[in-house]
Amino acid sequence: MVSKAKSIALYGLDGIVVEVEADITKLEEKFDIVGLPDTAVKESKDRVRSAIKNTSGNFPYTSITINLAPADVKKEGAYLDLPIAVTILRAVDNKLTRDIGGTIFIGELSLEGKLRPVTGVLPITLCAKKEGYKRIVLPYENAKEASLVSGIEIIPAENLKKVIEFLSGEEIEPYPFTEFVGKTADEYASDLKYVKGQYVARRALEVAVSGGHNMLMVGAPGSGKTMLAKCIPSIIPDMTFEEALETTAIYSVYGALDRKEGVIRKRPFVTPHHTATNIALVGGGQSVKPGLISLAHNGVLYLDEMPEYTRQTLECLRQPLEDGVITVSRAKANIKYPADFMLVASMNPCPCGNYGSATKECKCTDTQIRKYRAKISGPLLDRIDIQVQVDNVEYDQLVAKGDEESSETVRQRVNKARLIQRERFKDDGILCNAQMGERQLAKYCVLSPENDKLMKRSFEALGLSARARSRILKVARTIADLDYSETIEKKHLLEAIGYRSSMLDDM
C-alpha cells in the first residue's frame, strides 16, 4: 500500500514542495529512503522507527520504501522525520483517515517520539501559504515563528502521539497569529547624548542613517569612531513588517533565531571579527547557509578597523553592496540570499594612527601607509557614499557639563526623512534613497543648471567615477529630505560632495 504526505524542502530562502511516499509490502524486512536524501535524512530511518515503536508500537517490520519527490532536488536536514512517520502510520493504520491533502508536515523526531524544533520554519510556512496549503503541522517550539504568517493554520504538536490524534480526527487548537511590533530606540544602551563634540561626524551619521548610505569613519585611536557606530541602533528607524519577515527568515535558516521570541524585532547590527573567513562573511559551506552579510540584511554591517580584514575578504563585499544580494555557488546551482545592508566602517589613517595629527608624530613610513590603505581597493571605496574624518576631541569639550543632542531627537528627524522616502518610492519597490536606481535618480535627483555646473567641476577636480556621481546625488537627495526640500539645492549638493573628499583621496 502507498501512503502520501507533503513537506517542503528549502533551497536558500525558497521552498520546494516535497511529496513523501511510503510503499509497504510483505517482503523481507528493510527500510530504504530514495530521492536524493542527505545523511540527516538517511538517518531518519532509525529515529522514525524508534519514535513510532515508542509511541504507538505499530511499526511494520516489513519492506518499507520511502520516496522523496522530486527526485532531482537534494533534501537536507531532519525536518522530514515527521512526514515520513505520517506516511508509514497512515499506510498501516486505517483509522488515521483525516484528509491531509492541504497539510504540510515538518519536524524532527526524538527516539521517544517527541517533536524537536527545526530551522527554516518561517520560509517554509511562507512557501506553504504561497502554494495554497491550508495548514502546517510542526513542533510546538516552532509555532511562534510560523505564526507571523497569516492566512494559514499553524498546528503545533509536542510529540508524535498528538500528531496521531490529529490524523485520527481530533482537533488541535491552531496557534494564534502573532502581531508584529518593532523595537524602539529607548531599548538601546548607546546614546548620542554621551558623545562629546564630533559635530561633523554626528551630522554625517544622521545623513547616512536617514538615507541608508554606506559610511567610513577615519580617525586616530580613541577619537570616538566605535562609539559613534554603536549609537546607530538608537537612531535607525524600526523595521516594517515585511522587513522583519525577510530578516527573520534569514536568521531562521541560519539557526540563530530565538524561538521564544519567534521574530527579529530590531534591525540587525552585525560586527564580524577581522579574522572572519570569506565563507563566514558571504555564506556557503556544505549546506550553503547564509553568511554574516545576510544576517545584516535590513540592518548594519559594522567593520571596525577595516584594514585589519584581508583584502580578499573585503572584496567579497563589492557585489552585495551593488546588488543587495549575494550569490553563493555550489556544485549544481547558485543560491541567492538577501544582503541589502548599510555598511559602516572605521579605520585609522595609518598603522600607528597618528597620520595628520597636530599633537602626535606619525612614525609610519610612506610605504607602510600605502600598504595599510591599499587593503581597501578603489572600487570598494567608490561604493562608500560618506567618508568622514573623526578628529580627537579637545579636553575642555570632553569635560563640559551637560549632554549633547540625544539619539531620540536625531531619530525623530531620521524617521521624518524616511517617511518622505517611503512615500516617494511607494510605487518603486524600494524604501530609501540609497536603493535608487538610474530611473529614480533621473526622476528625483534633478539638478538646476547652476548645480549641474557645480557637479561637473567637482567631478573633474576630484576625478570621480560615474558611480561616485550617482552616490553623491543620492546623498544630496537625503540631505534635502532632512531639510524638507523638494529640490536639491546648492548647499545640499556641496555637503554631499564634501563627504567624498577627505584624507583618503590619495587611496
Regions found by a protein language model. Give the residues of each.
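Short loop/turn elements that form and flank the Walker-type P-loop nucleotide-binding site
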Residues: F59-T62, D99-I100, K130-G132, S150, ...
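Basic, amphipathic alpha-helical bundle interface domains used for macromolecular binding and assembly
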Residues: V34, A40-K45, P60, N67-G77, ...
